[in-house]
Regions:
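N-terminal Rossmann-fold NAD(P) dinucleotide-binding loop
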Residues: 45-46
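A conserved short coil-to-beta-strand element within the FAD-binding core of flavoproteins
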Residues: 155-169
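FAD/FMN-dependent oxidoreductases across multiple families
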Residues: 11-18, 249-251, 266-331, 351, ...
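Conserved FAD-binding catalytic core of PHBH/FMO-like flavoproteins
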Residues: 96, 105, 144-145, 166-170, ...
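Core beta-strand elements of the Rossmann-like FAD/NAD(P) dinucleotide-binding domain
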Residues: 32-34, 177-186
């Protein structure tokens, strides 16, 4: 996303929120050595740092700026992102502060008529909602505070040059008062759409630029609107173009107006012009002031590859999508979730470079899925030709009275976890399963109680390989099954009856979602994707599936 007049104090003469800043991290001149360097302390870089800490891998995070992000960044955090953040220890704070929502509404026409509403969480009995709205600076702050004990973050440290060698990467890092050399075994570029690392390496970032301009106004107000996503086609208050409204914490609301392609960009962000648009949307009775105003266009791009020997790209540094669908930051957090456990195993000697190639395979596939959805959304929302405009109007016109047409109304296909069914790490089924969940999918949460107070399946998994074992009085005892598992795989026994040696599926929801019978066994990856499943525990097959899920089988003779 390309923004102009991004700062409110530049564009409109004032800013209403003080940005949290950090002093430059003291460093020693000379040469230093660390296993992993992460460039960028945004949500993706910070999530990687938190995950590496859990994995026992030392890392340093280099951040060229002096504090938290500001302005119109990510606000919509999807259920899968919340599940990842829960494992990393920050989701409770996100839920406490954020605005929970599951419902979206689509309006159209001169009367702003409601076309239809949709529930983004049709499958209930899960720990987290479909989305939580929370300003990006809060998410960053929660990660920074979680990492505060021996923090790996080096503030105001800029990468000036790099050289990739056979045994790692040499960086020249500029700090406010000095310059130093830093050697790492692995370099992760999580430094955003204008990635310094990508530029220094001269790597591609091919894609498409969209010409339409959009105005974001984050306004502070006490409004009577519900906590839901509200989207307008042909908005009467926005000259017949699209508009979007979202609630954020602190009585802040995100208002997004399509302006078109050929506009006076300087005039668009003048206070009187912004106020005219906001007032037309809200009506005359609601008082408001501005937290942030920005004008943006956006791009859909990705690198050809995300893994370049010992340099790995994640988040916006690797792929860039439009904001419609909230697929940017959420996709980046899934990058981090996919990468951290794989690189940790390579560093510990438990896997080889083939496992990192699977990060490239799986996350390029996910990026293409996000790019496709983002591009389709943008094309539908911003028709470029009379034919495209006619199609949009016809579909929108049918949607109110004809449910079949609603599937074709595209106001942003919202972020969902990417499945990895075709991944080389996934073992195909040998047995019949009726559940919608398939190998390669992210595990679907469900109630699961244990004596230690955990109440949900995903709370039991953590960032490790787990063998989920559904049992009853007639199946082998948990201790017997555990003794047959490969090293590094934890057993999670589940029973419909209350037992001291198993977690309790009291409602039966978990068993139903996994089409589990007594004996059903599932191997789950550290990023909580289902790697393989069987109708009975089979030690040789479990071992083979583990070798496949860690890419070891790819290099075995």
């Amino acid at each position: 996303m390309t923004e102009q007049s991004m700062r409110l104090d530049m564009a409109m003469g004032r800013a209403s929120r003080t940005r949290r800043q950090f002093e430059a991290t003291p460093v020693t001149a000379g040469e230093q050595q660390v296993p992993v360097v992460i460039v960028g302390a945004g949500p993706v870089g910070l999530a990687l740092a938190a995950d590496f800490r859990q994995q026992g891998v030392s890392c340093v995070v280099l951040e060229k700026h002096d504090g938290l992000s500001q302005g119109s960044r990510a606000i919509c955090w999807a259920k899968r992102t919340l599940e990842i953040c829960d494992r990393l220890g920050v989701a409770t704070r996100m839920m406490h502060k954020g605005i929970t929502w599951n419902l979206g509404k689509v309006f159209a026409g001169a009367a702003s008529e409601l076309l239809y509403s949709f529930d983004l969480q049709p499958v209930k009995d899960q720990k987290f909602p479909a989305f939580v709205n929370l300003q990006q600076y809060y998410t960053e702050e929660y990660f920074i505070e979680a990492l505060a004990d021996e923090s790996p973050i080096r503030w105001q440290q800029r990468v000036d040059s790099l050289q990739v060698a056979h045994d790692g990467v040499w960086l020249t890092v500029a700090a406010p008062d000095t310059q130093y050399r830093l050697h790492c075994d692995w370099l992760i570029a999580a430094d955003g759409s204008r990635s310094t690392v990508r530029e220094l390496m001269g790597l591609d970032f091919a894609g498409r630029t969209f010409e339409d301009n959009f105005l974001i106004a984050d306004v502070r107000m006490k409004a009577p609107f519900p906590a839901e996503r509200r989207f307008w086609f042909n908005a009467p208050f926005n000259e017949g173009r699209t508009a979007l409204m979202h609630q954020q914490p602190d009585n802040v609301w995100r208002l997004d107006f399509q302006l078109g392609g050929d506009i006076d960009r300087a005039a668009a962000v003048r206070e009187e012009n912004v106020t005219r648009r906001v007032r037309a949307m809200l009506g005359p009775e609601i008082d408001f002031d501005y937290e942030w105003v920005s004008l943006y266009t956006f791009q859909c791009r990705r690198m050809t590859r995300f893994v370049h020997d010992r340099v790995i790209f994640a988040g916006d540094a690797a792929h860039l999508v439009s904001p419609f669908g909230a697929r940017g930051a959420n996709g980046g957090l899934q990058d981090a979730d996919n990468l951290a456990w794989k690189l940790a195993r390579v560093i510990k000697g438990e896997a080889n470079h083939a496992l990192l190639e699977s990060y490239n395979e799986e996350r390029v596939y996910a990026a293409d899925e996000n790019l496709l959805n983002s591009t389709r959304s943008t094309d539908f929302m911003t028709p470029k030709s009379p034919a495209e405009r006619a199609l949009q109007q016809a579909v929108v016109g049918l949607a109110k009275d004809h449910p079949f047409a609603r599937a074709f109304v595209n106001s942003g296909r919202l972020s969902v976890p990417c499945h990895q069914r075709s991944s080389a790490l996934t073992t195909p089924d040998e047995h019949e399963f009726a559940a919608a969940l398939q190998p390669g999918d992210v595990c679907l949460d469900a109630p699961l109680a244990s004596a230690d107070g955990r109440r949900w399946l995903l709370e039991h998994l953590g960032g490790r390989f787990v063998c989920l074992y559904f049992m009853d009085a007639h199946t082998p005892a948990p201790a017997t099954v555990a003794a047959t598992l490969p090293a590094g795989v934890a057993l999670l026994p589940v029973s419909r009856e209350a037992r001291a040696d198993a977690a309790h599926d009291a409602t039966g929801v978990l068993s139903a979602r996994y089409d589990a019978r007594p004996g059903t066994t599932c191997l789950i990856r550290p990023d909580q994707h289902l790697a393989a499943r069987w109708r009975q525990p089979d030690p040789p097959r479990i071992a083979a599936a583990l070798r496949r899920a860690t890419a070891i089988s790819f290099t075995e003779n």
